[in-house]
Regions:
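N-terminal export signals
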Residues: 1-8
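Low-complexity, acidic Ser/Thr/Pro-rich repeat tracts that form intrinsically disordered stalk/linker regions
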Residues: 9-17
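Early extracytoplasmic/lumenal segment of secretory-pathway proteins
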Residues: 17-108, 112
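Extracytoplasmic ligand-binding site segments that recognize negatively charged/polar headgroups
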Residues: 27-43, 48-54, 104-269
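Short helices/loops that flank or line small-molecule/ion binding pockets
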Residues: 59, 84-96, 111-112, 185, ...
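Extracytoplasmic/periplasmic substrate-binding proteins
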Residues: 256-325, 366
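Mature extracytoplasmic/periplasmic domains
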Residues: 318-426, 476
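Conserved C-terminal helix/tail region of periplasmic/extracytoplasmic solute-binding proteins
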Residues: 392-493
């Protein structure tokens, strides 16, 4: 569903017909970019700068593009709800220039040849306006460079936007951290009808594999392997028939244990106390904890010890949209750079709650924003129950500089934040060591897991009463007996 279209820079019919006006068609997720209109008291006053969102990000881009390049751009900005909806729109002939799919979808689009590669110029850190190349986290850059499709790196066709991990949001009054730190919680009958899982096959299958293989994944023999991260990815992306059958059986049990399979309702269910725990993406977990805190409810976030799913949304250009138009491609790449400007990355993080792939490079803005949210001094100013006695060092060098334990990026924070919003928004390097990315599945794998999911969501053999099985067996026996009798009768004739 299209929820909005921006047409910027005094876009009139005359300008639309003007050959000097570039039309840029962008498709993103709903409520996934700063739409402006901040209240007067919403200024983010950082050590390095003050940040506000008076206008929408799209309108600000239109103004910036004209000021920077002397060209008018008309942005047609559309929103969709799911990756599958986006793919269906593309196959039906809808045309966009720039889209923001999740990692598995841009892998699929790469495989099928839909995407336009980014220019070499886009990654030139010597160009002032290349905010993405200059500011992307070294950790994220390495991930996009090292992951490949058909021998080509993600970074050739995709630039990161937001990222995160998956885990369990939980109420510490009902659930211990240890109980929440394993995927086996989704089938723990102690929390029967008190926990939610995601209503999509990829996320919930990931959790099921983590639970089924829990003992193996947590064993020291497995963890100490030299190629541990590769082996972990193999295990979590196992779509063999035996594993999928095992996942089916496990999820049929889970179906009887959970409160619901949900996409969005789990947020309010956690905040209002309808559930004690729920599978969540870290970005949504931050939002849930913020809302709960506003209602004086404490919720925490745990990242399972078996493995966590590292996910991305990334900008990608479509061949069918760009269609060889160099000016349009320049505008699309400029939009990615504009939203990657540290101040704009902060605006988007503040507005949507997810974590930008931008660490800022030489700019201190992103780390200043981190301190503004989670630094001990800021926390003590907001809550007089927090003191130096609660202090703990939280190392994020791997994300900001690519150097573990970089003293410039050891955040002094409160211990509570290591189990709360900070841990969801910026997981530690140790957590990321046990992360895996769900790969794009080929047609055979997709058919197998989709059929499994249909069986889980539409039919549960564990719910069938014994008398039904007896009746079915009796009917089968009766059919066989009648068939034999019919054969004998015909032989006699």
């Amino acid at each position: 569903s299209i929820t909005g279209v921006w047409k910027g820079f005094n876009s009139t019919k005359a300008e639309a017909a003007d050959n000097d006006t570039i039309t840029l068609r962008i498709c993103n997720w709903e409520e996934y970019i700063d739409e402006g209109g901040w209240n007067a008291d919403e200024t983010i006053d950082l050590e390095s700068t003050d940040i506000r969102g008076d206008n929408s990000m799209v309108d600000d881009f239109v103004q910036w593009y004209y000021k920077t390049y002397g060209k008018k751009v008309n942005v047609e900005y559309s929103c969709l709800g799911t990756n599958e909806e986006l793919y269906n729109m593309l196959t039906l002939g809808d045309e966009y220039d720039l889209i923001c799919p999740s990692e598995y979808m841009f892998m699929k689009l790469m495989t099928e040849g839909w995407l336009e590669p980014f220019s070499d110029e886009f990654y030139d850190t010597g160009i002032k306006e290349n905010y993405y190349a200059k500011g992307v986290s070294p950790f994220i850059k390495q991930t996009f460079d090292n992951n490949t499709i058909n021998g080509e790196p993600w970074s050739k066709y995709a630039a990161g936007y937001m990222w995160g991990v998956t885990g369990i949001i939980y109420n510490p009054e009902d659930v211990t951290k240890q109980e929440a730190s394993t995927w086996k919680i989704i089938n723990n009958d102690k929390f029967r009808r008190m926990i939610t899982v995601k209503d999509n096959v990829r996320d919930t299958m990931f959790a099921a594999i983590g639970a089924i293989k829990s003992d193996k994944l947590r064993s020291q023999d497995f963890i100490r392997q030299a190629d541990y991260t590769d082996k972990l990815a193999e295990e979590m992306n196992d779509t063999s028939k035996d594993t999928v059958d095992e996942v089916l059986e496990y999820l049929q049990q889970v179906k009887d244990n959970v409160y619901s399979f949900e996409t969005d309702s789990g947020k309010i269910d956690a905040i209002t106390g309808k559930i004690s725990a729920g599978y969540q993406w870290s970005g949504d977990a931050v939002y849930i904890m913020q809302q709960a805190e506003a209602n004086d409810v404490e919720l925490n976030f745990a990242i399972p010890e078996e493995c966590t799913n590292m996910y991305f949304d990334g900008w990608a250009m479509l061949k069918s949209g760009i269609n060889g138009n160099s000016e349009k491609k320049k505008a699309a790449e400029a939009f990615v750079n504009f939203v990657s400007m540290p101040e704009n990355a902060v605006r988007n993080m503040y507005y949507i709650g997810y974590t930008s792939v931008i660490s800022g490079g030489q700019s201190p803005v992103i780390y200043d924003y981190l301190k503004w949210n989670y630094g001990l001094e800021s926390l003590m100013e907001e809550d007089d129950t927090i003191s130096e006695a609660d202090a703990i060092d939280y190392s994020l060098g791997y994300f900001f500089s690519g150097v573990s334990n970089d003293s410039r990026y050891i955040l002094r924070t409160s211990k509570a934040q290591t189990e709360g919003m900070l841990s969801a928004q910026y997981p530690t390097e140790e957590v990321m060591h046990r992360s895996a990315i769900m790969q794009y599945f080929d047609n055979d794998e997709t058919a197998r897991i989709n059929q499994m999911w249909i069986n889980v969501r539409c039919f549960n053999i564990h719910n069938v009463p014994v008398w039904v099985w007896i009746a079915v067996a009796a009917a089968i026996v009766a059919v066989i007996v009648l068939r034999i009798a019919d054969v004998i009768r015909h032989k006699k004739i």
